[in-house]
Amino acid sequence: MMFTGFPEATIQFFLDIRFHNNIAYFEENRARYERDVKAPFEAFIQELAPAMLSIDPQMELRPYRCMARLRRDVRFTKDKSPFRDHLWVLFRHAGEPREGSVMYWFELAPSGMNWGVGTWGENRQMMDILRRRIVADPDAVSYTHLRAHETGR
C-alpha cells in the first residue's frame, strides 16, 4: 500500500475510541482500526523506510516493531482505559532496547502531530557526548533550533 496521507477517518477513530474506550467497542470497530489506522501507519513506515536506511542501515523497519500498540498496558496505572487515543512510530537500531536508544519518532493524535529525534529514558553516556558536542559547536545547535522554530519543523 502506498502512503497517501492519514485520512480524516484516522482522527475520527481516535476520537471515537477516546469516548468509547472499552474492549466491546473496539471489537465492533476492529475493521475500522485495521483500515483507517493500522494500514495508513504501516504505509507511512514503508514510505519512510528508504530515508531511514540512508540515515542508518541497521534501522528497524518492520511495522510491527516500529508502531506502538493501540492496547495500553494498564497494570501499573490508575487510568485503566484499555486503548490509546493516539499512536506513534519509533525508528531505532534493530534489536536494541528502547531505553537509551537514539530514535526518530512520529506521533499522531486528535490534537495534532509531533515528531523528533531523541532517547527514551536516561542515558548518561549519550548525554555527556551531546553536551560535549554542544560546547564544541554551540552555533550548530543554535542554528538548528532557530531553523526549526522558523520553519515549524
Where are these regions (language model features)?
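Short, hydrophobic/aromatic alpha-helical segments in well-folded domains
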Residues: 12-13, 29-32, 116, 129-130
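Single conserved hydrophobic/aromatic residue that forms the stacking wall/gate
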Residues: 145-153
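Gly/Pro-rich turn-and-neighbor structural signature
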Residues: 34, 38-79
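Hydrophobic/aromatic-rich, well-ordered segments within soluble, folded domains that form packed cores
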Residues: 19-32, 98-110
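Short, charged, low-complexity amphipathic alpha-helix
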Residues: 1-27
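Aromatic- and glycine-enriched beta-alpha-beta binding-site module
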Residues: 75-137
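Active-site-proximal binding-pocket segments
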Residues: 39-44, 48, 126, 130, ...
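A non-catalytic, amphipathic alpha-helix used as a structural packing/dimerization or gating element
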Residues: 24-43, 136
